[in-house]
């Protein structure tokens, strides 16, 4: 399921992040991938140890927690803290697939934990007219989909998808990206639950008979109980 979720960040929030990232100390993005990825990855990335990365990442996680659509679509169990990248002129990232299992940050005294990447997320931090190229291109069974969204908007898609970032030919593209392990492993099941949840919310808003809504809500939770992993 490819889903555009608008206005995760307000215009003010997105602009503030842009300004702080403009003065950031970026490193070569190839340092974060293996030999295969390094052949096709040409961008900049905030270092893992950057205090700014943690600061902005926490702001994004807070914003995600305020989005009912994001929660309904992802049903998050674990989230890898947001990362940040920058594509300048001639930067690009060829077709690649995200790692299936990723290590979560370890807090002192805690047991190491990992995350299964079910959902890939890209949050755009500057507007499309600020750069040329730089489209996120996602390939699935229906073909290739080009994504280039306003600042503050989020795109989510299954982590099983091959994807790339087209060459930037003018300006600079800044984004945050992260992965989610969902309570529900299968993308088709998540899609069905989102459709059902959306229908329930619509019926509730139209004051449909309470018993009808209750029956549908019961079906939703029973499906979630059947499909979820905790």
Swiss-Prot record:
Cofactor notes: Binds 1 Fe(2+) ion per subunit.
Q: What is its EC number?
A: 1.14.11.-
**Start and end residues of each Fe2OG dioxygenase domain:** 78-182
- Judged by the first EC level, this protein's enzyme class is oxidoreductase
**A single GO BP:** intracellular iron ion homeostasis
Q: Could you say which cofactors this protein requires?
A: Fe(2+); L-ascorbate
UniProt entry keywords in alphabetical sequence: Dioxygenase, Iron, Metal-binding, Oxidoreductase, Vitamin C
What positions belong to coiled-coil segments? none
Q: Which residues bind 2-oxoglutarate?
A: 173
Instruction: Give the signal sequence positions.
Output: none
Which GO MF terms does the UniProt record name? 2-oxoglutarate-dependent dioxygenase activity; iron ion binding; L-ascorbic acid binding
> Which is a Pfam family this sequence falls into?
PKHD_C
Binding-site residues, Fe cation: 96, 98, 163
Q: Which domain of life is it from?
A: Bacteria
Q: Which PANTHER family match?
A: PKHD-TYPE HYDROXYLASE YBIX
**What HAMAP family does the database record attribute to this sequence?**
Hydroxyl_YbiX
Protein name per its UniProtKB record: PKHD-type hydroxylase XF_0598
Per the UniProt entry, what species is this protein from, by scientific name? Answer: Xylella fastidiosa (strain 9a5c)
